[in-house]
């Protein structure tokens, strides 16, 4: 017994619908692939400091962007093969993706507006990185030294490190603590990623609407599903 899916997309489906679908799907694929590569590099770098488990946002973004890439590939194949089952699978993937992406993006935006909670997390990470660098080859040219050089700052705060600096060796006049600079940078990154995710969600929602429109344009044979008996 062989199962045959007799649903096929209408060959006369206007290009006005199919064209935007392919364009939007390609845009989402490109943006998600860029995000996948970026978060992969960040995770690789953070893993060197054993920080991946402390920073769930990069890991979550990596998993979500990988899911986006897979979803867009399924969508591309669904359009190419013109099969209803594959297209329905793509739509289910897309709904799950939109829900997850909106949730993660909203959390990033909310976290960026909560400086006290954010400050505590960043401070703990700075402390762990500092301890790790003191006992490893990464003491010089490590992430703390890079931050101090870039912002011309010294240490995290007076309560944490006093007059100690990785790069400047001692506190000099004009070298403030790094906490305000790092916190501001992290807040900006979280806000940027949050709105980036919201924009992607809107594009995916439009793609979902186009996908639904495709289903209305399918042709049905006399029997939507048929079974062929073979000897």
Curated annotation (Swiss-Prot):
Keywords: Membrane, Transmembrane, Transmembrane helix. GO terms for cellular component: membrane. Signal peptide: none annotated. The keyword NAD does not apply. Residues 1-21, 80-83, 217-231 are cytoplasmic. It is a multi-pass membrane protein. Its main location: membrane. Residues 43-58, 105-195 are extracellular. Pfam families: Tetraspanin. The chain crosses the membrane at residues 22-42, 59-79, 84-104, 196-216. It is found in: Membrane. The keyword Transcription does not apply. It comes from the Eukaryota. Belongs to the tetraspanin (TM4SF) family. This is Probable tetraspanin tspE. It comes from Dictyostelium discoideum (Social amoeba).
């Amino acid at each position: 017994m062989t199962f045959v899916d007799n649903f096929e997309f209408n060959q006369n489906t206007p290009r006005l619908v199919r064209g935007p679908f392919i364009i939007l799907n390609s845009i989402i694929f490109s943006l998600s692939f860029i995000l996948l590569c970026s978060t992969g590099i960040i995770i690789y770098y953070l893993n060197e400091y054993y920080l991946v488990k402390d920073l769930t946002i990069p890991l979550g973004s990596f998993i979500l962007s990988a899911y986006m890439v897979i979803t867009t590939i399924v969508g591309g194949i669904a359009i190419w093969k013109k099969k209803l089952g594959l297209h329905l699978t793509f739509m289910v993937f897309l709904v799950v993706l939109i829900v997850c992406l909106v949730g993660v993006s909203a959390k990033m935006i909310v976290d960026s507006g909560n400086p006290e909670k954010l400050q505590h997390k960043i401070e703990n990470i700075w402390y762990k990185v500092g301890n790790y660098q003191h006992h490893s080859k990464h003491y010089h040219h490590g992430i703390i030294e890079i931050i101090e050089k870039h912002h011309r700052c010294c240490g995290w705060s007076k309560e944490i490190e006093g007059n100690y600096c990785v790069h400047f060796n001692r506190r000099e006049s004009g070298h403030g603590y790094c906490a305000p600079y790092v916190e501001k940078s992290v807040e900006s990154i979280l806000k940027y990623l949050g709105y980036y995710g919201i924009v992607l969600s809107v594009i995916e929602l439009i793609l979902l609407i186009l996908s639904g429109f495709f289903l209305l344009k399918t042709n049905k044979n006399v029997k939507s599903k048929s079974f062929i008996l073979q000897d």
